[in-house]
């Protein structure tokens, strides 16, 4: 049985840890509100961009001059897998769930004989995938020194992806991230970026009122300008969803840790009090026994 001194030290240690987890929970809660607002504000713009692309893409059906970012290369042999995670841990299974989904996709492609290249965004994803896919990682991004993720970071990633695509390095690009739902729910999500994935009902959801639109210049020229911007927008939305999800998961994880620390302190206090009571009882028995012997 642990001594009273050991128990006091353990109680003090757990209380110190509880203070840290409580502080981290409060910090995550403060950051979550801003991150959630940013993620929710980005969704309508990205969805509207999908609808614009759907309308423009309709006019490109069957045309041989469709932009490569929309039409693709005509092959799906080489895949670029973009894995977006957090740079830091202590957020429950947030990072591991994204990596797990990406790893399943990678293993499936490899099993089909496809070539896979990986671009990681976030230190946790890079570290996890380096263990069994180090040779496939072509580029890694970290934003540990950046206080708030901005559109310029998404544009930087987008430029890298487009440069790799134009250099013939891959045929299909898919990004893996976590879609924020609420504090306790983040959904690991996969979204195809190249060729641009246009929802089948996006174009039909726009009421054209029977009007016929003429584009100047034509759809192809407009798409050449819009598609790179759309790629940046979709990556930016994924990053914002990730940030909100990370803080939500961290807030939940630290809340659980704080509660668990409280439960442990109660159990240790009970053990301490019982040990102390047993020690006092033993000393009393010894005193009484000594007195009777006299």
UniProtKB/Swiss-Prot annotation:
Highest rank taxon of the organism: Bacteria
Annotated InterPro entries: ATP_synth_F1_ATPase_gsu, ATP_synth_F1_gsu, ATP_synth_F1_gsu_CS
GO MF term set: ATP binding; proton-transporting ATP synthase activity, rotational mechanism
Pfam families: ATP-synt
GO biological process: proton motive force-driven plasma membrane ATP synthesis
Predominant subcellular localization, coarse grouping: membrane
Keywords: ATP synthesis, Cell inner membrane, Cell membrane, CF(1), Hydrogen ion transport, Ion transport, Membrane, Transport
UniProt topology in membrane: Peripheral membrane protein
KW Ligase (keyword) present: no
Intracellular or extracellular location(s): Cell inner membrane
GO cellular component, one term: plasma membrane
Record PROSITE patterns: ATPASE_GAMMA
Cell inner membrane is among the record's keywords: yes
Function: Produces ATP from ADP in the presence of a proton gradient across the membrane. The gamma chain is believed to be important in regulating ATPase activity and the flow of protons through the CF(0) complex.
Database matches in NCBIfam families: ATPsyn_F1gamma, PRK05621.1-4
Assembly notes: F-type ATPases have 2 components, CF(1) - the catalytic core - and CF(0) - the membrane proton channel. CF(1) has five subunits: alpha(3), beta(3), gamma(1), delta(1), epsilon(1). CF(0) has three main subunits: a, b and c.
PANTHER family, per database record: ATP SYNTHASE GAMMA CHAIN, ATP SYNTHASE SUBUNIT GAMMA, MITOCHONDRIAL
Similarity annotation: Belongs to the ATPase gamma chain family.
HAMAP family documented for this protein: ATP_synth_gamma_bact
Protein name: ATP synthase gamma chain
